[in-house]
Amino acid sequence: NVCHGSDSVESANKEIDLWFK
């Protein structure tokens, strides 16, 4: 998330989805 600067939206959304699940 914070580490990712370029793909903060796409990567974050996918990572967040996994965290929520």
Swiss-Prot record:
Subcellular location: Cytoplasm
UniProt-listed InterPro entries: NDK-like_dom, NDK-like_dom_sf, Nucleoside_diP_kinase_AS
Organism superkingdom: Eukaryota
Cofactors (names): Mg(2+)
Enzyme class: transferase
Gene3D superfamilies: Nucleoside diphosphate kinase-like domain
SUPFAM superfamilies linked: Nucleoside diphosphate kinase, NDK (SSF54919)
GO biological process, one term: nucleotide metabolic process
One example GO MF annotation: ATP binding
Catalytic residue positions: 4
Keyword match Nucleotide-binding: yes
Keyword line: ATP-binding, Cytoplasm, Kinase, Magnesium, Metal-binding, Nucleotide metabolism, Nucleotide-binding, Phosphoprotein, Transferase
Name of this protein: Nucleoside diphosphate kinase
